[in-house]
């Protein structure tokens, strides 16, 4: 288990460093749509990385790779704790020899963050 009492890292910096190109391109489109509606909450009313609005006492456990396909994609499951236990699944892709997060599935987004973002982009041309 890892614990952190520090502030949440900047989301954009985190995603640029650890997420796939496709994830980041989609995230930029979502940010552009949200910027057209100042004062509105936008697509995300919580931080999916910490599974809440506030960074309490973040930890994770039971991190396990459940599948690897063609040495290019993998699925990872873990339990995130930020006030309560939340099961998460990450889809990983290999880009330029490094594993990057390509999607995150949680209870609010059973089809994944990327599917939710893609729908939001389609609905807000």
Residues of each region from the PLM?
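Acidic side chains
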Residues: 47, 102-103
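Surface-exposed, charged secondary-structure patches
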Residues: 15-84
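Short, aromatic-enriched amphipathic alpha-helices that serve as compact interaction elements
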Residues: 1-5, 9
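Low-complexity, intrinsically disordered terminal/linker segments enriched in charged
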Residues: 36-37, 67-89, 95-96, 103-125
């Amino acid at each position: 288990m890892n614990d952190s009492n520090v502030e949440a890292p900047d989301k954009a910096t985190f995603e640029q460093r650890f997420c796939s190109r496709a994830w980041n391109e989609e995230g930029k489109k979502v940010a552009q749509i949200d910027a057209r509606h100042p004062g509105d909450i936008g697509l995300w009313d919580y931080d999916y990385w910490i599974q809440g609005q506030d960074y309490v006492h973040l930890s994770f456990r039971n991190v396990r790779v459940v599948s690897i396909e063609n040495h290019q994609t993998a699925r990872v499951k873990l339990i995130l704790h930020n006030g309560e236990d939340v099961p998460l699944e990450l889809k990983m892709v290999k880009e330029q020899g490094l594993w990057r997060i390509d999607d995150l599935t949680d209870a609010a987004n059973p089809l994944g963050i990327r599917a939710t973002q893609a729908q939001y982009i389609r609905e807000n041309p």
